[in-house]
Amino acid sequence: MSLYMLVSTFAVAFIITVIGVPLFIPFLVKLKFGQSIRDEGPKMHEKKSGTPTMGAVIFITAMLISFLIFSFISGEVSAATWLLFITLALFGALGFLDDYIKVVQKRNLGLTSKQKFLGQVAISILFYLVYHFSDFAETLKIPFTNTEIDLGWFFIIFILFWLVGFSNAVNLTDGLDGLVSGLSVIAFSAFGVIAFYQEQMDVAIFCFAIVGGMLGFLLFNKNPAKIFMGDTGSLALGGSIAAVSILVHQEWLLLLIGIIFVIETASVILQVFYFKATGGKRIFRMTPIHHHFELGGWSEWRVVLTFWGIGLIGAIISVCVVIF
């Protein structure tokens, strides 16, 4: 019965997305909600200018509908259900505001860094408050052991770092057609299997709703992309995957399951630090690191497939660590 629920959750999110996206694309085109390409980006990306963005509105809607339907049908409505719901919805809303400013008000950078950060912090604090008053364990598991450390009030610092950090990490990674969509399918599949193995059906249902929605969206987001998810999607997915890792108490495995997100973010941090320390020298041709490979002659599709492969290896290892 539980496996049937997961398959059904996946299927409904997938079907709604596959039906909804083709209907949404002409609407976005009519409103001229097209992606602007930053001048400092790779020149080969200029052809993407005007591609409809904010496609995440469809797959987030599909995910939330499927998630809630099968959470109630299965009787698996819990505090975790509402934590995941508000995380996906609120990070998505923050991203939507950022996208709206970019495409409607024609401010290419969207929200300022300070505004976006304050929004992320506010959502993370709300997550902590719901988590805290739901009597979840505020502990951190030591990797490859069964030992957990009680963080006490320091747990809120960890929550802020984890949710804000990974929402930004996924946002940084979303620069190539299909890259984040495919990585999300891989990562949430891994966490879905882990949650199912740990008998956390509420979290597993959420994960497979996301897998269904993202796989449906990938059909239109793969190279050459007909639509982009925008910050609406990348912030929502990043915040959600961090939340899932906390709820299944496998936080550190996210560093392996989401290894590409970590590498992409690290490349930006290293580039900025080295640039400032050396007075203008660079480690990479351009960051995030996927652009480094593009400028080195790799096709966009080759970069995406390679990064998917690395993400898949990390996900398989992580699932094996938990199960075996």
Curated annotation (Swiss-Prot):
Its EC number is 2.7.8.13. One of its GO terms (molecular function) is phospho-N-acetylmuramoyl-pentapeptide-transferase activity. GO terms for biological process: cell division; cell wall organization; peptidoglycan biosynthetic process; regulation of cell shape. It comes from the Bacteria. One of its GO terms (cellular component) is plasma membrane. It is found in: Cell membrane. The chain crosses the membrane at residues 9-29, 53-73, 77-97, 117-137, 149-169, 176-196, 201-221, 227-247, 253-273, 304-324. Its main location: membrane. It is a multi-pass membrane protein. Pathway: Cell wall biogenesis; peptidoglycan biosynthesis. Its cofactor is Mg(2+). Belongs to the glycosyltransferase 4 family. MraY subfamily. PANTHER family: PHOSPHO-N-ACETYLMURAMOYL-PENTAPEPTIDE-TRANSFERASE (PTHR22926), PHOSPHO-N-ACETYLMURAMOYL-PENTAPEPTIDE-TRANSFERASE HOMOLOG (PTHR22926:SF5). This is Phospho-N-acetylmuramoyl-pentapeptide-transferase. It comes from Listeria innocua serovar 6a (strain ATCC BAA-680 / CLIP 11262). The lineage of its organism: Bacteria, Bacillati, Bacillota, Bacilli, Bacillales.
